[in-house]
């Protein structure tokens, strides 16, 4: 225990301000509408008494704002997986983190890291034991997606994409929830992430390379594959092409609920350092394509008032005008070693490079 506490005491980073009141979006101040919190992410958890309980007080950062010390206490194992080796935080969606227990192998959805959820009564929703399809695995998870803001909603469907062919769905609010497991045949989806399209009411997966989009309709038990055609691709300089060729490419599919638009983001990242066998990567280039219903992916440097948020959580879009600190026509990206803002019009890059324990951007939460 003393060794764990000693390691934790060295991990807390940065200066912060202390606050018990979180600022609300000016864009939702009307009394006729619910208030909305600004997008944020967890920076760390500050070790607190009683130390033997291994609890920490959350330190968060609202996007483009200072860090804030909260009074909310969380189990440190949610942030420091490598120290405690009890649970693995495998993804997040709508402010809920998904964890996989090393003791019982159960996947749980928890709101502990959501600064706007209950301080005294955190929720932990266990899902049924995972079922592994033949020639598949359920130990390594690509990401988790939810069809609504809470797994307690009656119609909420949770999708878990595993590395490899398996895609699994569950309705946690049912009296006897169970998994619906699908084996994906096309290998271009094996390492891809799943997202939920509110516009279509279906889960979608972007294939590696960004040329195919798979859609799964759970109600009619159907799926379809759409091939994308890239258009309006700009002519790039030789230097830029060489830079892109030296990078790893990450594709993201994200939908704007307010405008109904769907975007494909190609993010080019390069390893800048190897630390204890782990690659620290930096965003070198980024391209945004707007998708239409005909399968066209049109390159654009103008997404208007929108901001695209990318992290290890499910991606989302917001209107910048609803939150004064946001930059319109930009992309925000948070990873384990990088926090970067890219303004698309003039490709202005604002970058922070430091470790992030929980690189899960939390979208705005509705509060009373």
Name what the model sees in each region:
Residues 84-274:
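A sequence/structural signal of beta-propeller blade repeats
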Residues 44, 61, 77-79, 110, ...:
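A structural detector for beta-sheet-dominated domains
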Residues 18, 40-42, 188-191, 230, ...:
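A broad structural signal for short, well-ordered beta-strand segments within beta-sheet-rich domains
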Residues 2-94, 98-106, 115:
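A non-catalytic, helix-rich entry segment at domain boundaries
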Residues 34-39, 62-67, 89-96, 147-156, ...:
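Short, solvent-exposed coil/turn segments at beta-strand boundaries
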Residues 39-41, 95-97, 123-127, 354, ...:
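Tryptophan-centric aromatic hotspots in well-structured domains and transmembrane helices
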Residues 51, 149-151, 161, 244, ...:
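Sterically constrained small-residue positions within well-ordered secondary structures
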Residues 2-7, 53-70, 75-83, 91, ...:
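C-terminal closing repeat unit and adjoining cap/tail of repeat-based domains
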